[in-house]
């Protein structure tokens, strides 16, 4: 804010989410349940801020390609070159500005698919690892979320690669993606591109995000740490993201995300000391809004105790019946109308009436952080491709994380055993708390 003539500053790039225009109000402040910094936060911290409309959206030309490294990725590299030559940017060298990236969702994915070595640090929020896995996990298409995304793109007048619409149509109508559609989604990375990421990376992912759930950030972090570069990686799980936090929100959640983001940029972009050293390696908020930290990421050896929380059940008969007594949609006058109206209401997992239930009674004080493992044996006859697994918090009646896990089944009359990792959760057991595992016929 307020550079004098001849002064220079480090640069932060802030691409927007899908269906959103670049932010142009320099005084915009961070709101509740926010996953990142606002323009005012960045400028007040002493950074030049660059925002833009991604290709195919709003004032930009071209055709939207879903953060493809050969299209949107090259656009970002061109912006970095422009920042070096045409703005009052501090430089590391010729055509190499001191630059970091912040932003969420579509604006988080592009940070990992650009893979420009000039980028000094990234803070991808509520982003994906694999669009195929995120949008069609276990070959079960997320029809509600596809509808939300399609309406956002159409409402914004986006000009889109027609193969993307084709995939949405076949997914919605037939729960099927062609090889072409899968290839288009695969081209949006980051997956294999993560092997090239050297920029220090701080992930911010939502515990109640049913579009890009926690496992997407976990996979990204694992991939970057497997590189030989020694890249610093830290992670925050907050109550928010795609969807809505129905649980209590810690009053310091947003301010922590903002201060951590600025500290990350200060350390790795501006080079003003090492405030990022004080950021916990892993921090998360549980279902009651309580803040926790760890020196280990949730997938690293030593994070979990050797003896896990376990529960077993005797099973029963489950009918796979579309629409009736399944998981979702979200209902209730206590919630904002925007999340209880079609199609957003359909994106929430809820306690189901048609379900097999297994009691889970962990010890008070236990923390269940990560992906529960589920295994069961079944047989059946029918045309269904999957059942759904979810954990219900008996204290609130809500599904932990608002999220269910599709479990692929083969209903050929023979006995099968299936084992899956459920959606990651962050749950602390208090006095009187318990869970119910539900195996649900429809979500």
Say what each PLM segment does:
Residues 1-47, 52-55, 67, 104-105:
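N-terminal cap/lid subdomain of alpha/beta-hydrolase-fold enzymes
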Residues 2-8, 63-72, 78-105:
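Gly/Ser-rich "nucleophile elbow"/oxyanion-hole loop immediately N-terminal to the catalytic nucleophile
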Residues 25-44, 59, 73, 85, ...:
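Accessory cap/linker subdomain of secreted extracellular hydrolases
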Residues 57-78, 247-257:
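Catalytic nucleophile-loop/oxyanion-hole region of alpha/beta-hydrolase
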Residues 197, 203-205, 209:
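Short beta-strand/loop motif that positions the catalytic acidic residue
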Residues 199, 213-223, 373:
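Short alpha-helix in the alpha/beta-hydrolase fold that links the catalytic acid
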Residues 224-244:
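Catalytic histidine neighborhood in serine/cysteine hydrolases
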Residues 252-443:
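C-terminal, loop-rich substrate-recognition/catalytic regions characterized by aromatic stacking residues
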């Amino acid at each position: 804010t307020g550079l004098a003539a001849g002064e220079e500053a480090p640069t932060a790039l802030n691409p927007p989410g899908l269906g959103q225009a670049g932010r142009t109000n320099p005084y915009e402040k961070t709101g509740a349940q926010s996953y990142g910094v606002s323009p005012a936060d960045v400028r007040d911290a002493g950074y030049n801020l660059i925002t833009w409309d991604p290709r195919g959206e709003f004032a930009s030309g071209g055709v939207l390609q879903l953060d493809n490294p050969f299209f949107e990725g090259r656009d970002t590299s061109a912006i970095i070159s422009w920042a070096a030559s045409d703005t009052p940017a501090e430089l590391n060298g010729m055509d190499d500005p001191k630059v970091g990236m912040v932003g969420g969702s579509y604006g988080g994915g592009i940070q990992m698919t650009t893979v420009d070595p000039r980028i000094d640090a990234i803070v991808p929020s509520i982003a994906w690892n694999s669009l195929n896995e995120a949008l069609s996990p276990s070959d079960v298409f997320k029809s509600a979320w596809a509808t939300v995304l399609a309406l956002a793109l159409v409402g914004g007048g986006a000009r889109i690669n027609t193969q993307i619409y084709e995939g949405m149509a076949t997914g919605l109508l037939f729960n099927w993606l062609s090889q072409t559609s899968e290839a288009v989604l695969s081209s949006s990375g980051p997956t294999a591109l993560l092997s090239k990421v050297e920029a220090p990376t701080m992930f911010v992912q939502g515990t109640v995000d049913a579009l890009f759930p926690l496992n997407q950030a976990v996979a990204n972090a694992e991939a970057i740490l497997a590189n030989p570069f020694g890249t610093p990686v830290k992670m925050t799980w907050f109550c928010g993201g795609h969807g809505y936090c129905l649980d209590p929100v810690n009053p310091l959640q947003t301010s922590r995300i903002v201060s951590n983001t600025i500290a990350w940029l200060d350390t790795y972009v501006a080079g003003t000391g090492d405030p990022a050293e004080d950021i916990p390696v892993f921090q998360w908020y549980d279902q009651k809004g309580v803040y926790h930290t760890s020196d280990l990421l949730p997938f690293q050896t030593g994070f979990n105790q050797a003896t896990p929380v376990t529960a077993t059940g005797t099973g029963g008969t489950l009918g796979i019946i579309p629409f009736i007594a399944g998981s979702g949609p979200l209902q209730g006058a206590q919630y904002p109308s925007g999340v209880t109206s079609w199609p957003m209401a359909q994106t929430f997992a809820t306690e189901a009436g048609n379900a097999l239930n297994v009691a889970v009674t962990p010890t008070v004080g236990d923390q269940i952080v990560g992906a529960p493992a589920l295994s069961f044996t079944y047989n059946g006859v029918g045309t269904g491709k999957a059942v759904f697994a979810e954990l219900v918090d008996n204290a609130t009646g809500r599904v932990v994380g608002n999220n269910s896990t599709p479990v692929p089944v083969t209903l050929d009359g023979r006995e099968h055993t299936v084992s899956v990792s459920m959606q990651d959760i962050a749950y602390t057991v208090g006095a009187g708390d318990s869970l119910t595992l539900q195996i649900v016929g429809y979500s």
